[in-house]
Swiss-Prot record:
The keyword NADP does not apply. This is Glutamate 5-kinase. Residues 276-350 form the PUA domain. GO terms for molecular function: ATP binding; glutamate 5-kinase activity; RNA binding. It comes from the Bacteria.
C-alpha cells in the first residue's frame, strides 16, 4: 500500500464513558489501530477530544459540566491525564508522541500558522506522532467548535493529508436518525457535500461531546475544499484504520476525488485571515483574475475602502458589489488610493516601485 499521510480525529463519544471519564479499553483500542497505521509505513496525526471528559470526575463533577468555567476547569485537569494515558499506551509500541494545543488565533495569525506548519512537518520527519487538541482550558471557541471536527479538517489541509478519518459513535451518515428510524438509509459514499446532505445532519451531539453529524459534515466539506478525502464512521480492533484505507471501513466515504490541494499560504488567506479592507475593481480586471489567473494591477482598481497596511488581506469586489475573492495587498490603502486606475508604465515613471501588482496571483484566493 502506498505511504499516505493520515489525520485521525477521535471524538469524546469514542473515548469516554458518560460517568467515569476516559475509557482505558477504548483508548487502548484506538492506539493499537493507530500503531498499525504507523507499522504499515503511514504518517499519522491524531486529533483528540476528551480533555473535559477526562477531567470532570477528578474535580468531583457527577457528569460533564455545562458551564463554561466548569468545562474549562475540567479541561485543564483532563488534558494532562489524557496525554499521559496516550503516551503510556503508545510507548508499548515504541512510538514517540508530541502534544500540540491549538486555538483559533493560532490559525488566524500568519506567523503562528506558519510555525504550526513547520513544527508538524518536523515531527513527522522525525517519525513522531503528533497528538493535537484545542486548548480548551482557555479557548471559548472549542465549546462551540464541533468537538474538534473543524480543527481536524483545518489541520488536514495544513499538512496536505491524503485522508481525514473522523471516528465517532455512529457508523456513517444517514438520511435520518438511525436510532429513531428503522428505515434510515445509510450513505456509503458521497462524492461531495451538497446543501441537501448538509441539511440532513442534525445539530445535537452525544452527552459526552459537543459535536454531532452537522459539525462532521461541515468539517468534511472544508477538508474536501483543501484537497483531503474524508471518512466518517466507527470501528473496533487493531485493523480498523487500515481497513478504512482499503475501502472496508464501517462508515461513509466522502469525496473520492477532492478538489486540488491548496497551498498553505492560500489556505491561510481563504480560511483564517482577518479582512482589513475592500478593493473594488472593474469588469476587465475581474475577468483577467477569475478566468485567466492574472494578478490584480492598479489600472483595474476603481475604489478602495478601509485602512489597511502592506501585506494585509483585503476582499475584492466587482462594481456591482459581488465579492469575488481576497488576497494579500502589496499596497497600503493610502498608497493604493493614490495609484488606483493608473497604468503600470505611469507608476513606473514615478520611480517609486519595482513591482506593480496590487495582489499577486500567488497570494489570491477566489471565493
Amino acid at each position: 500500500m502506498k505511504k499516505q499521510r493520515i489525520v485521525v480525529k477521535i471524538g469524546s463519544s469514542s473515548l469516554a464513558d458518560s460517568h467515569e471519564g476516559i475509557s482505558k479499553e477504548q483508548l487502548s483500542d484506538h492506539v493499537a489501530a493507530l500503531a498499525r497505521l504507523k507499522e504499515e509505513g503511514h504518517e499519522v496525526l491524531l486529533i483528540t477530544s476528551g480533555a473535559v471528559a477526562a477531567g470532570f470526575s477528578a474535580l468531583g463533577y457527577p457528569s460533564r459540566p455545562v458551564t463554561i468555567k466548569g468545562k474549562q476547569a475540567a479541561a485543564a485537569v483532563g488534558q494532562s491525564l489524557l496525554m499521559q494515558a496516550y503516551t503510556e499506551e503508545f510507548r508499548k509500541y515504541g512510538i514517540v508522541t508530541a502534544q500540540l494545543l491549538l486555538t483559533r488565533s493560532d490559525f488566524s495569525r500568519k506567523e503562528q500558522y506558519s510555525n504550526a506548519y513547520a513544527t508538524l512537518g518536523e515531527l513527522l520527519n522525525r517519525s513522531a506522532l503528533p497528538i493535537i487538541n484545542e486548548n480548551d482550558s482557555i479557548s471559548l471557541e472549542e465549546l462551540t467548535f464541533g468537538d474538534n471536527d473543524m480543527l481536524s479538517a483545518l489541520v488536514s489541509g495544513l499538512v496536505s493529508a491524503d485522508m481525514l478519518m473522523i471516528f465517532t459513535d455512529v457508523n456513517g451518515l444517514y438520511d435520518k436518525n438511525p436510532q429513531k428510524n428503522e428505515d434510515a438509509k445509510k450513505y456509503y459514499f458521497l462524492p461531495e457535500v451538497t446543501e441537501e446532505i448538509a441539511s440532513l445532519a442534525g445539530d445535537a451531539g452525544s452527552k459526552l461531546g459537543t459535536g454531532g453529524m452537522k459539525s462532521k459534515v461541515d468539517a468534511a466539506k472544508t477538508a474536501l475544499s483543501l484537497g483531503v478525502s474524508v471518512f466518517i464512521g466507527t470501528g473496533r480492533g487493531q485493523e480498523k484504520f487500515v481497513d478504512v484505507l482499503k475501502g472496508k471501513g464501517d462508515g461513509t466515504y466522502v469525496g473520492n476525488a477532492p478538489q486540488k490541494e491548496m497551498k498553505m499560504n492560500k489556505q491561510w488567506i481563504a480560511l483564517h485571515s482577518v479582512v482589513s479592507g475592500q478593493i473594488e475593481i472593474d469588469a476587465g480586471a475581474a475577468t483577467a483574475i477569475i478566468q485567466h489567473g492574472k494578478s490584480l494591477l492598479p489600472a483595474g482598481v476603481t475604489n478602495v475602502s478601509g485602512f489597511f497596511q502592506v501585506g494585509e488581506v483585503v476582499e475584492v469586489m466587482t462594481q456591482q458589489g459581488r465579492v469575488i475573492g481576497k488576497g494579500q495587498c502589496t499596497y497600503s490603502a493610502e498608497e493604493l488610493r493614490d495609484v488606483k486606475g493608473m497604468q503600470s508604465q505611469h507608476i513606473q515613471a514615478r520611480g517609486e516601485r519595482h513591482s506593480y501588482e496590487v495582489i499577486h496571483r500567488d497570494h489570491w484566493v477566489s471565493l
